[in-house]
Amino acid sequence: MADPIMHLQVVILSLILHLADSVADSVNVDGVAGLSITLPCRYNGAITSMCWNRGTCSVFSCPDGIVWTNGTHVTYRKETRYKLLGNLSRRDVSLTIANTAVSDSGIYCCRVKHSGWFNDMKITISLKIGPPRVTIPIVRTVRTSTTVPTTTTTTLPTTTTLPTTTTLPTTMTLPTTTTLPMTTTLPTTTTVPMTTTLPTTLPTTTTLPTTLPTTTTLPTTLPTTTTLPTTMTLPMTTTLPTTTTLPTTTTLPTTTTLPTTTTLPTTTLPTMTLPTTTTLPTTMTLPMTTTLPTTTTLPTTTTLPTTTMVSTFVPPTPLPMQDHEPVATSPSSAQPAETHPVTLLGATRTQPTSSPLYSYTTDGSDTVTESSDGLWNNNQTQLSPEHSPQMVNTTEGIYAGVCISVLVLLAVLGVVIAKKYFFKKEIQQLSVSFSNHQFKTLQNAVKKEVHAEDNIYIENNLYAMNQDPVVLFESLRP
């Protein structure tokens, strides 16, 4: 039992060690924005594939890979800024990032593939990109020209001690005072890198002027906003309230005169008690007066147009030769066209008097030639029919007679219609008055028995109702 347990423990420990994937120590790399930075990564053993991952590496692969290789060549590059400038055949897979930015800061992982489970090599690199450094040259002014006159003036009194020439070598310290070229080394001792820490704060202060111009742009935008009062022409569009003439269309309430049409109830429709005078059917003798249409036999006098036969006869009295013009026959003649033989000096020919298809032109010998629209095909002569003034008078008489007869008929019809209208109106008035005044007398008359000997006459006279109905019924009472 102990051997399987020990074997299981060994397997678990080996798995824990392999899960570590032989992770190397994490490396921190600092850089400056705008420059290139190299993230180191090398491996040993056989040449194999590898990948660079943005962020920590997972157990099996590079989930956010930015560069992939097959061992000798780059197979994938997320951006052109990512380059492997090392010798891949010598297992140098260091990553170079060109033109770095502050956003490039973060964790990078170099993963090298090895055979076997959990044998991949992983190197985690923490990259920190700082802002770019601005170097400000420091100019130092050394006023050495002021010291040279002072040294020359001081040496002149010392030249008076010529006997003590031994002091001259001591005065040879003047060349030592010519350390002015030594002061020229000051540009070399411009320890600018030492003072570069100060400019790192200075750019932060110099950013303030950069922000100040941005604030100066605000006044430039303010004048642009002053153009908004120029857009205050919108109050000029307040002419829209002048369109408040629409309330003047409130004259529609003046159309409330429609309630004045409520005078219809004042038509005293309760006076429709006339239907209560339905006793009029008791006077159903009034339909007996419908014999008035029998008087419409007057239109039978329309036989008057038959009198037009009188005007169609023309006496056959020849007249001397004269020019004749064609006369159009009356269109009102309803009878068939009559032909009259006319005897002239030449040959005779009968022609219908009512035919509108012939027109004649006469020459001096009373011969008639057919017009260009005639029906004859040969050039033959024809005598024109004889027309007398008596025939013209008869046609005029026909017109006059027809007109007079029509007027008479219209007058008769007008009289009949007017009489019928007034008669009907009078009958209605009489029936209403009779029903109102003699209703009780009629009831009394109905109660009495009517004997066979009573002389009751119902005259079929159209104009009998012109009498007073009261007098009529008084005379009929026993």
From Swiss-Prot:
Intrachain S-S bonds: C41-C110, C51-C62, C57-C109
Topological domain spans for side Cytoplasmic: 419-478
Topological domain ranges for the Extracellular compartment: 25-397
Region of interest: Disordered: 187-303, 320-339, 344-370
Annotated region described as 28 X 6 AA approximate tandem repeats of L-P-[MT]-T-[MT]-T, given as residue ranges: 148-309
SUPFAM superfamilies: Immunoglobulin (SSF48726)
A GO-annotated cellular component: cell surface
Residues listed as glycosylation sites in the UniProt record: N70, N87, N379, N393
Record-linked PROSITE patterns: IG_LIKE, IG_MHC
Gene Ontology BP term (one): positive regulation of mast cell activation
InterPro entries in alphabetical order: Ig-like_dom, Ig-like_dom_sf, Ig-like_fold, Ig/MHC_CS, Ig_sub, Ig_V-set, TIM_domain-containing_protein
Transmembrane feature ranges: 398-418
Topology of this chain in the membrane: Single-pass type I membrane protein
Name under which the protein is recorded: Hepatitis A virus cellular receptor 1
